[in-house]
Amino acid sequence: SLTVAWVYLSDDPAENIELVPEPQIVATQEESGSTVVMDLPEQQEEQEVPINAPAEIDEPPVQSTPQISSTSIPETQVNQSDLSLAETQTPLSQVPNDNLVMQGDNGLLPVMGPDGLIAWKEYARPFQETDTAPRISILITDVGLNTKSSTAAIDTLPGQIDLGFSAYGRNLQNWMDKSRAKGHEAFLMIPTEPINYPDNDPGPHTLIAEATERDNLLRLNWLLSQVTGYVGVVNHMGSKFTASEEALTPVLTDLQSRGLMLIDSRSTRFSMAARTARRLNMPRAINDRYIDNVITSEEIQRQLAELENTATTFGAALGLARATPLTINEIARWSMSLSE
């Protein structure tokens, strides 16, 4: 059987291993708990690439429309009563924990608390470490940008599905509070420079590879201040920024000092994000597959099946998808099948 859940990190970062399946380049996209992340074998140092990401990626702008096939099946709404949501949407603790925030220039900033209190553990969804089933983690990105899609993601999906919040959304704390009330862990999307910036612009306060350390940290502080209650961050776009260890190091050092974890969306095979996080002993996870490059029921289900295969083979797998109505419905249907 398979379980939708985050696999928790060991308390000792040296024991953490980053899960990297054998790369199979078949599709394209530049985007977007506590998870077991496994140290890369030395011979795989140049193989950090999502299964369905190409060697080079044309990045859509932040408001681009995902590819929709002409054969797309009309979406149908999932009957929430069929999802046993009450069993999965156990409320998480209210945020913020006053010991984990400080007042910054633009709002509350995450900080480490006393006695080892850290955000990626405190805000995490509870986890049964004795469950040895293969684990699938899914992160739905772009939450907070669209009211209908954000509501559907929060209310329709099981609590084990994590949500990635855009720093550009309105009323983000309200969305965060609603999502935690339904059991969802949250990540904050951090816009990072793509190779063809500014033609493709992730948005204001994008982290830039050639900017000064001070400028990037000021931008990062603005982004982190837009909402509180997330366990970590995920890079949005970033094929240029994430390929620069020099640019990444001060940013990840700051994030690690705040008790946050990292998801490397791996929008490019040249991403150094997870590798740099490992060097800094930062909790981290690596995207294995983009689920909804092509938004059709058939293709989304095919990608989910491939994610299952990865989890069965390696013990855990992580996939990213966007908060579109069809994607949300298909992931909800798929999650039902795992419990059957």
Regions found by a protein language model. Name each.
Residues 6-111:
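Juxtamembrane proline-rich low-complexity "stalk" or linker regions positioned immediately after a signal peptide
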Residues 108-112, 133-140, 236, 291-295:
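Glycine-rich phosphate-binding "P-loop"
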